[in-house]
Amino acid sequence: RIQDIVTALAYLDSRDDVGRRSLLGLGSAGIYCLLARAMAAGVHRTCADLSGFDPASDRCWLERCFVPAIRAAGDVRTVMALIAPGHLLIHGAGGGFPTAWARATYRWAGRPDRLTRFGKRQTRANIVEWITRI
């Protein structure tokens, strides 16, 4: 699934009739979108609805997004380090989401304003408003 997202982005990047590309992962696609963004350059904005996904839980990784050795590789901490300082909206994350670490990463990247984190899931209207900002 992650590779499919990266491949789709590469295809869009190859087209002259496509402008800015943003990623929006809703429901179970939120974590895949977040992981794919770490491997894709040139994405304008990324919005990941984690739908309660708890990156501190082995069970979550096993049941919802099995990636061998992801925890040993730094899980979402490494992902956010690769995404920063890109625009990132994360919402609906489980209790184990490393919010303080995410904020520190964006501060170190010099763009703390580009990370938006909400505990609750956002409405579609809020997401559309955020993702279409210039």
For the regions a language model picked out, list residue spans one by one.
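Conserved strand-to-loop "acid loop" that flanks and positions the catalytic carboxylate
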Residues: A84-G95
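C-terminal catalytic histidine-bearing segment of alpha/beta-hydrolase fold enzymes
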Residues: E63, G95-A100, Y106-I134
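Hydrophobic anchor at the start of a short beta-strand
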Residues: G19-R21, L88, D113-L115
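Primarily recognizes the serine-hydrolase "nucleophile elbow" in alpha/beta-hydrolase
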Residues: Q3-V79
